[in-house]
Amino acid sequence: MRLKDKVAIITGAGTGIGEATAHKFVREGARVVLAGLPDDPVKDVAEVIAAGGGEAEAYLGDLSEEAAARACVEAAVRRFGKIDVLVNNAGVFIANAETQDYRVEDFERTIRCNLRTAFLMTKFALPHLQKTRGNILFTGSEAGISGSARFTPYGASKGFLHAFAKGVALEQAHYGVRANCVCPGPIDTAWTRGPGGPLSLEIQKSIDQMVPLGRRGSPEEIANVFAFLASDEASYVTGALWLVDGGVTPAKGMAGAMVPEELRRIPAVTLPLRHAHDGLRGKHVHLAEK
């Protein structure tokens, strides 16, 4: 159990990658504080963990608000006495429009959720992480490396997190605190599959052909990398961007079209996930199709 006796805060823990990371960390021995917006099924995830014998505390609030972020950190320390790991996973992908048509309110929501939340949680958690020589993990994106047409603010927000993670890693190294960023490609969640999301059905159909491995990733595959980076096995890893994207970042053309059908299947889920495709609930996605 790589995370035995460690305490982790996971933001955006109600659905998708956050839900999978919560279950993976508990399976590896961690005790967790699961944070999410009031409409997110965070309490349900905590109840499933508790039913399986794990320890989880649910915290509901808008972590882009200073008071809520501070209170989340305080709740973790009050419940478990310390913090070893912070997973800055919360974020939104809420609009599909060329930059001249991108609504200012969607831009501001993206900045608040994706940047401000991560900054505030990092700020308030660091004094506790310095005591435990803990580590911080961020959910970045391949879009933050390559850029993304029609989602320019989203890609830019992830690019900020990449640079922020590196800066925190350099700054906090003398405290023994590590910081790393995982950069997923297209993952099988509500953001990339089904109606009502930011991707058109045409783009959704082409994803598997654009990814060299010929398929979307699963939330569990991202959680597996988070678990390694959070563990002492990664003690010499800091300031790193970990691409977990099926090869889409260096790819050109439709490399995935050559992958045989049997390799296109997403691996079977081993974690008790119930909300992998619920991430859009209450997020008010805006599409400006042309």
Model features per residue range: what roles?
Residues A97-T99, R103-E108, I207:
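Substrate-binding pocket helix/loop in short-chain dehydrogenase/reductase
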Residues E28-D44:
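Conserved glycine-rich Rossmann-like NAD(P)H-binding loop of the short-chain dehydrogenase/reductase
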Residues C181, L201-V237, W242-G246, P272-K290:
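C-terminal helical subdomain
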